[in-house]
Amino acid sequence: MVNGLIAYLLSPKAEELRRHFIFRIVPMLNPDGVIYGNYRCSLLGCDLNRKWDKPNKYLHPPIYYAKNIIRHLQQERKVVLFCDLHGHSRKQNAFFYGCCYKNYEHEGRIKNAHLRIIPLMCCQKNELFKLKGCRFRLERGRESTARVAIFKEFNIMNSFTLECSFFGKENNVKKKAIDKHDPFAALKQ
């Protein structure tokens, strides 16, 4: 996913984006765990995506320092998008988990509509993205995830988790078949 994102951002298609935005990409935050087969947990057995609300400098250093990067960037200019990239083990396609404002008065409804613009644009531009898989909530038990902690602490409205299925997109007869040996082949296109 990150390779595809970087390739796109460096392509002529993203020239206009590069003119208006500065992109900061923090690579994999759990390399030690992944090397030993843990895609969620560090070598200490900590699910690092559940430590974003109060990361410990010594127990969760990748999260602690990633938040420091965001804090530093916020001092320089407004951060308009935070996106945590994940692989999903059950659902197919690509989809976003986002946040929402609890104020359902007029202003809250407008802000909540704005939160859906980036996912909607992705769905319109790429058949791998499915709006029906997207969720925009502040659920119990998710307060310590990256998207929720960043949304609340830094007031970054566009704070998302982008999930891409380990199994590719839904197998639809009208669409290309999924390469079962490389489920991310379609994402690289």
Predicted segments with their positions:
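Structured catalytic-domain cores with a bias toward divalent-metal coordination
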Residues: 1-189
